[in-house]
From Swiss-Prot:
<comment type="function">
    <text>Component of the eukaryotic translation initiation factor 3 (eIF-3) complex, which is required for several steps in the initiation of protein synthesis. The eIF-3 complex associates with the 40S ribosome and facilitates the recruitment of eIF-1, eIF-1A, eIF-2:GTP:methionyl-tRNAi and eIF-5 to form the 43S pre-initiation complex (43S PIC). The eIF-3 complex stimulates mRNA recruitment to the 43S PIC and scanning of the mRNA for AUG recognition.</text>
</comment>
<dbReference type="GO" id="GO:0016282">
    <property type="term" value="C:eukaryotic 43S preinitiation complex"/>
</dbReference>
<keyword id="KW-0396">Initiation factor</keyword>
<dbReference type="InterPro" id="IPR036322">
    <property type="entry name" value="WD40_repeat_dom_sf"/>
</dbReference>
<feature type="modified residue" description="Phosphothreonine">
    <location>
        <position position="219"/>
    </location>
</feature>
<keyword id="KW-0677">Repeat</keyword>
<dbReference type="InterPro" id="IPR019775">
    <property type="entry name" value="WD40_repeat_CS"/>
</dbReference>
<dbReference type="InterPro" id="IPR001680">
    <property type="entry name" value="WD40_rpt"/>
</dbReference>
<dbReference type="GO" id="GO:0005852">
    <property type="term" value="C:eukaryotic translation initiation factor 3 complex"/>
</dbReference>
<feature type="modified residue" description="Phosphotyrosine">
    <location>
        <position position="308"/>
    </location>
</feature>
<dbReference type="GO" id="GO:0003743">
    <property type="term" value="F:translation initiation factor activity"/>
</dbReference>
<dbReference type="Pfam" id="PF24805">
    <property type="entry name" value="EIF3I"/>
</dbReference>
<keyword id="KW-1017">Isopeptide bond</keyword>
<feature type="cross-link" description="Glycyl lysine isopeptide (Lys-Gly) (interchain with G-Cter in ubiquitin)">
    <location>
        <position position="282"/>
    </location>
</feature>
<dbReference type="GO" id="GO:0006413">
    <property type="term" value="P:translational initiation"/>
</dbReference>
<protein>
    <recommendedName>
        <fullName>Eukaryotic translation initiation factor 3 subunit I</fullName>
    </recommendedName>
</protein>
<dbReference type="GO" id="GO:0001732">
    <property type="term" value="P:formation of cytoplasmic translation initiation complex"/>
</dbReference>
């Protein structure tokens, strides 16, 4: 399984994301550059230039018309995917940590950090109403008083937002009223990443408490746990197999000149139902910060602390693999 190596960032990768069809891969890092690549051959299609700080999050809408990015330069920006033109600039008081388009691509949400004396908020903008963008006034703003949001995604059909907090809590916020619909605390430490399944019925969380967990998206009921010995930075669900991939490793600040084996910098594959690990993929020099499955399930990508993104196309053996219970 020889990976395609994407070199387009000078700093560590913060998030990677495929569009719905999977022909494009968006990558953001702790530098101000937003890159888009052809996932089939790793060719760089272009960059979205404008941010002046680390970019924490990226998302593309349903028909890949618009791209949304959130950055530590205290802004969330909307781009035209094809031309790279900046369509909107939404200023915030603190860094934008998570962002996302809803199911229809009309409403965006983003969450800001609790820093510099400012509160953590989730803001909602309707892109069909230009006055909201021009005046920088969201139609709804949810304050998070307790612990800041570290990862968030839109729930099924854009009815709610599922947010993971620094404390390990999971909240489901109504996208209509802003109230907390469900609150659970299954993790003991910060939730680094949340990714939904293809049909949006369940999602996987990755946490600093060395586990990834599977939840039901409507009830937030805890289903499965995948345990490792290191903090998990990212986890993704396969669209056509009962597989989950975990990326993690030591925290960046703890990584010294240890060998790559000691730091446990592999991507790890677990069976969804049996919670058993069945494979590992080495490669990154440093922890893996973000993983994503291609929507057709035939490949996956990982972005690391080393600033590289690797696209791995699975060998034929992967598709013939039978898990023996």
């Amino acid at each position: 399984m020889k990976p395609i190596l994407l070199q387009g960032h000078e700093r560590s990768i913060t998030q990677i994301k495929y569009n719905r069809e999977g022909d494009l891969l968006f990558t953001v890092a702790k530098d101000p550059i937003v890159n888009v690549w052809y996932s089939v051959n790793g060719e760089r299609l272009g960059t979205y230039m404008g941010h002046t700080g680390a970019v924490w999050c990226v998302d593309a809408d349903w028909d890949t018309k618009h791209v949304l990015t959130g950055s530590a330069d205290n802004s969330c920006r909307l781009w035209d995917c094809e031309t790279g033109k900046q369509l909107a600039l939404l200023k915030t008081n603190s860094a934008v940590r998570t962002c996302g388009f809803d199911f229809g691509g009309n409403i965006i949400m983003f969450s800001t950090d609790k820093q510099m004396g400012y509160q953590c908020f989730v803001s909602f903008f309707d892109l069909r109403d230009p006055s909201q963008i021009d005046s920088n006034e969201p139609y709804m703003k949810i304050p998070c008083n307790d612990s800041k949001i570290t990862s968030a995604v839109w729930g099924p059909l854009g009815e709610c937002v599922i947010a993971g907090h620094e404390s390990g809590e999971l909240n489901q916020y109504s996208a209509k009223s802003g109230e907390v619909l469900v609150n659970v605390k299954e993790h003991s430490r910060q939730i680094n990443d949340i990714q939904l399944s293809r049909d949006m019925t369940m999602f996987v969380t990755a946490s600093k408490d060395n586990t990834a967990k599977l939840f039901d998206s409507t009830t937030l009921e805890h289903q499965k746990t995948f345990r490792t010995e290191r903090p998990v930075n990212s986890a993704a669900l396969s669209p056509n197999y009962d597989h989950v991939v975990l990326g993690g490793g030591q925290e960046a600040m703890d990584v010294t000149t240890t060998s790559t084996r000691i730091g446990k910098f592999e991507a790890r594959f677990f069976h969804l139902a049996f919670e058993e690990e069945f494979g590992r993929v080495k490669g990154h020099f440093g922890p893996i910060n973000s993983v994503a499955f291609h929507p057709d399930g035939k490949s996956y990508s990982s972005g690391g602390e080393d600033g590289y993104v690797r696209i791995h196309y699975f060998d034929p053996q992967y598709f013939e693999f039978e898990f023996e219970a």
